[in-house]
């Protein structure tokens, strides 16, 4: 074969490359439109039956010289790239996505700027039991410079016979204590009907793990001008967690804090399994601040310090933990709450590694 003939073949290969490129991009645009249609219908983007049908059709029409296995490998990569295009389009469309808003969202809680680069703490009892109990914890928190107090007034429990909380009376106690100690308060709301009433008493609406996909509650929380702390569901994927936050933001409320609180696995050594890798993933995928609840993720008082260190080291915007004047007589979760001296020691060990906004 002469050099001229070789050059002609190379030119032909170059032309075919450009034709293939054009067809691949044309296919990509079609796939993106299919993705939009599937999203509108609520259908999964990946359809293994459809993919197998397409591969079978391609192989049946393969006249060589490539082996069927080679052709199948090439087209599976094309299909994979198309699926990634659909997922990229979906993530770009989300209001919570960092692709939509590159800069960090800062959540203002009575002057505390969550997400500004300074790491903070939220502490308080698992459940509001009395004014005296909450006031004692508030005094200890205030002494340590903590400005956000947590406390459960409505308690969704696994058993219907466990303590369910004081309800509105608990919110009133939180409000009274917060006013006396100049603190912000956060408390869980479990039904949309309670949100309007709760606004008079709390500074942050908490949506707990069991309600992460209570979509009516998410929409109701998104419709009010009050910060929301959203906890990850017991067995929720990160994608499901992000989409739950999207429900809130889609209603107009962008003051959202995400909270990793452990997920359910087969491990029984801890109450849940802390997914520490979720923190940087959520920080990369969204523009929202991320907290870690070390109490519910472990269920063990002896693990609160190392898990809090891990949370701060990996870049969480803050740590949430439970404190009780006398955990041994607590009406809920006594094994995982810190007594006040334990809390003070815990915080003193963490303070040297806390990142402060310059």
UniProtKB/Swiss-Prot annotation:
PROSITE patterns membership: CHORISMATE_MUT_2
Pfam families noted in UniProt: CM_2, DAHP_synth_1
Catalytic activity as recorded in UniProt: D-erythrose 4-phosphate + phosphoenolpyruvate + H2O = 7-phospho-2-dehydro-3-deoxy-D-arabino-heptonate + phosphate; chorismate = prephenate
Gene3D superfamilies membership: Aldolase class I, Chorismate mutase
Highest taxon in the source lineage: Bacteria
MF terms in GO: 3-deoxy-7-phosphoheptulonate synthase activity; aldehyde-lyase activity; chorismate mutase activity
Protein name as catalogued: Protein AroA(G)
Organism: Bacillus subtilis (strain 168)
């Amino acid at each position: 074969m002469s050099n001229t003939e070789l050059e002609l073949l190379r030119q032909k290969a170059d032309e075919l490359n450009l034709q293939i490129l054009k067809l691949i991009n044309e296919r990509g645009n079609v796939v993106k439109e299919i993705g939009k249609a599937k999203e509108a219908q609520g259908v999964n983007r990946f359809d293994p039956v459809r993919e197998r049908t397409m591969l079978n059709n391609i192989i049946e029409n393969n006249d060589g010289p490539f082996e069927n296995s080679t052709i199948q490998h090439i087209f599976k990569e094309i299909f994979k790239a198309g699926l990634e295009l659909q997922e990229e389009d979906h993530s770009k469309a989300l209001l919570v996505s960092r692709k939509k808003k590159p800069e960090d969202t800062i959540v203002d809680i009575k002057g505390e700027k969550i997400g500004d680069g300074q790491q903070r703490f939220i502490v308080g009892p698992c459940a509001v039991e009395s004014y005296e109990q909450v006031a004692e914890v508030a005094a200890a928190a205030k002494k340590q410079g903590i400005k956000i107090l947590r406390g459960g007034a409505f308690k969704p429990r696994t058993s219907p016979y466990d303590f369910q909380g004081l309800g509105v009376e608990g919110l009133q106690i939180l409000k009274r204590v917060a006013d006396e100690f100049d603190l912000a308060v956060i408390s869980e709301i479990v039904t949309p009907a309670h949100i309007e009433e709760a606004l008079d008493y709390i500074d942050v609406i908490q949506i707990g793990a069991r309600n992460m996909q209570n979509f009516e509650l998410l929409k109701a929380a998104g419709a009010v001008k009050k910060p929301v702390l959203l906890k990850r569901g017991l067995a929720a994927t990160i994608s499901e967690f992000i989409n739950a936050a999207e429900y809130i933001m889609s209603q107009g409320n962008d003051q959202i804090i995400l909270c990793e609180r452990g997920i359910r696995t087969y491990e029984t050594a801890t109450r849940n399994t802390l997914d520490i890798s979720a923190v940087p993933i959520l920080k990369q995928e969204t523009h929202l601040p991320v907290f870690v609840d070390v109490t519910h993720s472990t269920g063990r008082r002896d693990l609160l310090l190392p898990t809090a260190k891990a949370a701060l080291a990996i870049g969480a915007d803050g740590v949430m933990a439970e404190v009780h004047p006398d955990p041994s007589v607590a009406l809920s979760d006594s094994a995982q709450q810190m007594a006040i001296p334990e809390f003070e020691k815990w915080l003193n060990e963490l303070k040297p590694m806390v990142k402060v906004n310059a």
